[in-house]
UniProtKB/Swiss-Prot annotation:
Gene it is expressed from: glnS
Lineage: Bacteria, Pseudomonadati, Pseudomonadota, Gammaproteobacteria, Enterobacterales
Broad class of where this protein is predominantly found: cytoplasm
Motif 'KMSKS' region: where in chain: 268-272
Family classification: Belongs to the class-I aminoacyl-tRNA synthetase family.
Top EC class, one word: ligase
Localization per Swiss-Prot or TrEMBL: Cytoplasm
Residue numbers covered by motif 'HIGH' region: 34-44
Residues holding ATP: 35-37, 41-47, 231, 261-262, 269-271
The name this protein goes by in its record: Glutamine--tRNA ligase
Length: 554
């Protein structure tokens, strides 16, 4: 497949193709402009893949610009986290990291230009009064009593704002547009507000800060952005974007295009709701493996390639829709099925003793991947006492049960055929030990007499077992659309985290965070970056071997 054929197609790329063909632009320049007031989530990944992917495919540029206009909510911690997430996803920004605060002097000068043109005024209504005067979708707004101040008075008052002569909330700079506009965003929007807060980039130089709608379009223009890509909730804001650029002296006028944001089943994307999950300790942090944050997905074991593939599959449209969680899970499942080495771990262990096994043990050879001989093999210790999963044994079972049954045979993965002879139980009737015999002539081969042994189960040698904690993560919410619930916290899935104490083959003592394994017959797991220790590794389940939620929804 050629590079051109491999490219995704969507309405934004069609616009870019037309712009390049007509000569409107000779290169493509996009940007990703997050506000550093939280951690990025899977929805941001869609925007990252779109903006950086377009720049990559068209051999253009993509800027990383922090929209840092509200020092009260922002922190350098988020700046560092966002940079790390973008790089982890496999993208590189053009030149240095940019900040909207880099342009505060120019933004201030453009605000003065609007005042001089009679297109901006200092308003002393309270924030509550401004909301009241703005009107509603069905009622037009009404003019502020301060709307018709002279240019000279507005210049003096704006300087007083900058000098700290007003308290917070006592004055703001507003655009003078149309209080009767059918678009509320055009009813004299606020351009500057007062905040006495230290800024992570500019310190205490400023006590007035520009609003997003004023900052965004000018920053795009100053950086020479050709295509400014936003999600659909900014569709009406495009009118203000164009109004600002049309009314200041700036040579470049980028165009804004909107696409649908990512909505994903069984989770929430609202920063407020995600913050509530963290602050109320429903999860252990922003990187909790159940969170839709990029850091959470990474800790859970998602790969950058799987997230990029997911963003490619869902595409870019103008229609809002909700994506099934199974779509995301299938991307990581396919990636790890192809690339993850295999290992054995027993999650719910029960002891199995092979009574006729002689000697202290031996090493058996196992492929690291059944379909990729180039991934090599490993030596796994085998002995007369092993751990198997409790679900892999029954005293009685029907023919559909292809595991170990009392009086019947099963194969141990890459080892011997065994037969269950008897069991030992505790006072409550729970099986504590399964006693078996083995066929010594069946190491990785069929029985000599031709009898068929259909089932295969995994195991771990008890003498060599590595004790591990296994965290079985599942979907955070029990309903597809938790945001629609009266109280989204009431539909948290109580089974979203189940912690088990199990045993793994000893090779897993060398596991490192970020490297996935398929625990055979169990699912895909990775070492937890936060809780693991050399003495007690902790493994997170990334995803199961198959979609167990499909039956739930039927």
């Amino acid at each position: 497949m050629s590079e051109a054929e491999a490219r995704p197609t969507n309405f934004i790329r069609q616009i870019i193709d037309e712009d390049l063909a007509s000569g409107k632009h000779i290169t493509v320049h996009t940007r990703f402009p997050p506000e550093p007031n939280g951690y990025l989530h899977i929805g941001h990944a869609k925007s990252i893949c779109l903006n950086f992917g377009i720049a990559q495919d068209y051999k253009g540029q993509c800027n990383l610009r922090f929209d840092d206009t509200n020092p009260v909510k922002e922190d350098i911690e988020y700046v560092d986290s966002i940079k790390n997430d973008v790089e982890w996803l496999g993208f590189h920004w053009s030149g240095n990291v940019r900040y909207s605060s880099d342009y505060f002097d120019q933004l201030h000068a453009y605000a003065i230009e609007l005042i001089n043109k009679g297109l901006a005024y200092v308003d002393e209504l309270t924030p509550e009064q401004i909301r009241e005067y703005r009107g509603t979708l069905t009622q037009p707004g009404k003019n502020s009593p301060y709307r018709d101040r002279s240019v000279e008075e507005n210049l003096a008052l704006f300087e007083k704002m900058r000098a700290g002569g007003f308290e917070e909330g006592k004055a703001c700079l507003r655009a003078k547009i149309d209080m009767a506009s059918p678009f509320i965003v055009m009813r004299d929007p606020v351009l500057y507000r007062i905040k006495f807060a230290e800024h992570h980039q500019t310190g205490n130089k400023w006590c007035i800060y520009p609003m997003y709608d004023f900052t965004h379009c000018i920053s795009d223009a100053l950086e020479g952005i050709t295509h400014s890509l936003c999600t659909l909730e900014f569709q009406d804001n495009r009118r203000l974007y164009d109004w600002v650029l049309d009314n200041i002296t700036i040579p470049v006028h980028p165009r804004q295009y909107e696409f649908s944001r990512l909505n994903l089943e069984y989770t929430v994307m609202s920063k407020r709701k995600l913050n509530l999950l963290v602050t109320d300790k429903h999860v252990e942090g922003w990187d909790d493996p159940r969170m839709p944050t990029i850091s959470g997905l990474r800790r859970r074991g998602y790969t950058a390639a799987s997230i990029r593939e997911f963003c490619k599959r869902i595409g870019v449209t103008k229609q809002d829709n909700t994506i099934e969680m199974a779509s995301l899970e299938s991307c990581i499942r396919e990636d790890l099925n192809e690339n993850a080495p295999r290992a054995m771990a027993v999650i719910d262990p029960v002891k199995l003793v092979i009574e006729n096994y002689q000697g202290e043990g031996e090493m058996v050879t196992m492929p690291n991947h059944p379909n990729k001989p180039e991934m090599g093999s490993r030596q796994v210790p085998f002995s007369g006492e092993i751990w198997i999963d409790r679900a892999d044994f029954r005293e009685e079972a029907n023919k559909q049960y292809k595991r170990l049954v009392l009086g019947k045979e099963v194969r141990l993965r890459n080892a011997y055929v065994i037969k269950a002879e008897r069991v030992e139980k505790d006072a409550e009737g729970n099986i504590t030990t399964i006693f078996c015999t083995y066929d010594a002539d069946t190491l990785s081969k069929d029985p000599a007499d031709g009898r068929k042994v259909k089932g295969v189960i995994h195991w771990v040698s008890a003498a060599h077992a590595l004790p591990v904690e296994i965290r079985l993560y599942d979907r955070l919410f029990s309903v597809p659309n938790p945001g629609a619930a009266d109280d989204f916290l009431s539909v948290i899935n109580p089974e979203s985290l189940v912690i088990k104490q199990g045993f793994a083959e000893p090779s897993l003592k060398d596991a490192v965070a970020g490297k996935a394994f398929q625990f055979e017959r169990e699912g895909y797991f990775c070492l937890d970056s936060r809780h693991s220790t050399a003495e007690k590794p902790v493994f997170n389940r990334t995803v199961g071997l198959r979609d167990t939620w499909a039956k739930v929804g039927e």
